């Protein structure tokens, strides 16, 4: 199934993640700690923890950091208790935004998120105001030139729901979140390595931003992503790169 081009945006997203590697480590330590607290420190028995540890490996985080985070979460070491909160809001031209946070101070976090929205042309919404526009799923992206037929066969056999190819040849695979690890392992066993592999909130529809609106929207997203308590930002905005 064909779709519009996402490949440039994926490459841009990867580059931005590389630029923020130090912050990514901090976020992953929080995620590993909370995952271990919620589901235990056994990676084999805790899918959320396994996903976080896999992300840490992809981000070249030292194993000692990962081990300490698991120990803090499972009670082996003292540490901060983080609360998970999701905020919803609107960006430029009403674009939908979800902001996932982990915090030890809810009052501080909501104030910082609200300030970022208002400073850069957005506004906070109420619970449920935009969440219905997104679907929780596993998402994989493969580079142009990947064998689409073989990838599709392996993905669908492993439990993927959808495989789409954009106009540049980049391939997106979508699966239920609980099947993410199984699909990832099956694709790796078949010889496929994803450029990006994440569990995300995927928008049902997208809005393309160009020119000045794209610049304004990117500033808002950057402001939210740069907040210390923010783990993930999801939006239905597609920023066209100049």
From Swiss-Prot:
Q: Entry's HAMAP family?
A: Transcrip_reg_TACO1
Q: Would you tell me the protein name for this molecule? A: Probable transcriptional regulatory protein HEAR0561
Q: Which Gene3D superfamilies match?
A: 1.10.10.200, 3.30.70.980
Task: Please list the GO terms describing molecular function.
Answer: DNA binding
Origin species: Herminiimonas arsenicoxydans
Q: Where in the cell is it found?
A: Cytoplasm
| Keyword Ubl conjugation annotated | no
Which family is this protein grouped under?
Answer: Belongs to the TACO1 family.
A GO CC term?
cytosol
The principal location of this protein is cytoplasm
Keyword annotations of the record: Cytoplasm, DNA-binding, Transcription, Transcription regulation
Reply yes or no: does the keyword Transcription apply.
yes
Give one Pfam hit by family name. Answer: TACO1_YebC_N
A GO BP term, please? regulation of DNA-templated transcription
The source's domain of life comes to Bacteria
């Amino acid at each position: 199934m064909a779709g519009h081009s996402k490949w440039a945006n994926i490459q841009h997203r990867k580059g931005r993640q590389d630029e923020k590697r130090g912050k990514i480590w901090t976020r992953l330590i929080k995620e590993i700690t909370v995952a271990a607290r919620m589901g235990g420190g056994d990676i084999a028995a805790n899918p959320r923890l396994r996903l976080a540890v896999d992300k840490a490996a992809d981000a070249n985080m030292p194993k000692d950091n990962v081990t300490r985070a698991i120990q803090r979460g499972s009670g082996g070491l003292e540490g901060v208790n983080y609360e998970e909160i999701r905020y919803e809001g609107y960006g430029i031209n009403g674009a939908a935004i979800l902001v996932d946070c982990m915090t030890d101070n809810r009052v501080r976090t909501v104030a910082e998120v609200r300030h970022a929205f208002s400073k850069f042309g957005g506004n906070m919404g109420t619970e449920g105001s935009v969440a219905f526009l997104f679907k929780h799923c596993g998402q994989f992206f493969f580079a142009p030139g990947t064998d689409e037929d073989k990838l599709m066969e392996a993905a669908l056999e492993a439990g993927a729901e959808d495989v789409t190819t954009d106009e540049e040849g980049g391939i997106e695979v979508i699966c239920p979140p609980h099947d993410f690890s199984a699909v990832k392992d099956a694709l790796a066993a078949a010889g496929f390595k994803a450029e990006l592999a994440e569990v995300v909130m995927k928008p049902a529809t997208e809005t393309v931003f160009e020119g000045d609106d794209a610049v304004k929207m990117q500033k808002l997203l950057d402001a939210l992503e740069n907040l210390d308590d923010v783990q993930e930002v999801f939006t239905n905005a597609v920023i066209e790169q100049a």
